[in-house]
Each structure stands twice: as C-alpha cells, then as structure tokens.
C-alpha cells in the first residue's frame, strides 16, 4: 500500500 508515498490515484489503480 504505497498510497502515502505515491500519488494516490495512479498507484491506487495498479495496486487495486
């Protein structure tokens, strides 16, 4: 869960 370090929205889609 790298939402705090990465821009929540780009990584959120990849992690999800």
Curated annotation (Swiss-Prot):
Keyword hit for Transcription regulation: no
Record carries keyword Secreted: yes
Localization of this protein: Secreted
Entry comment describing in which tissues the protein is expressed: Expressed by the skin glands.
Entry similarity comment: Belongs to the histone H2A family.
Name this protein carries in UniProt: Buforin-EC
Coiled coil regions, renumbered to chain: none
Keywords linked to the UniProt accession: Amphibian defense peptide, Antibiotic, Antimicrobial, Secreted
BP terms from Gene Ontology: defense response to bacterium
An annotated GO cellular component: extracellular region
PROSITE patterns according to UniProt: HISTONE_H2A (PS00046)
Function text: Has antibacterial activity against E.coli HP101BA (MIC=9.6 uM), K.pneumoniae PTCC1388 (MIC=10.6 uM), M.luteus PTCC1625 (MIC=6.0 uM) and S.aureus PTCC1431 (MIC=8.1 uM). Has no or very limited (<3%) hemolytic activity at concentrations of 15 ug/ml and 60 ug/ml, respectively.
InterPro entries referenced in this protein's UniProt entry, alphabetically: Histone-fold, Histone_H2A_CS
GO terms of molecular function: protein heterodimerization activity
């Amino acid at each position: 869960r790298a939402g705090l370090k990465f821009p929540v929205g780009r990584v959120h889609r990849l992690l999800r």
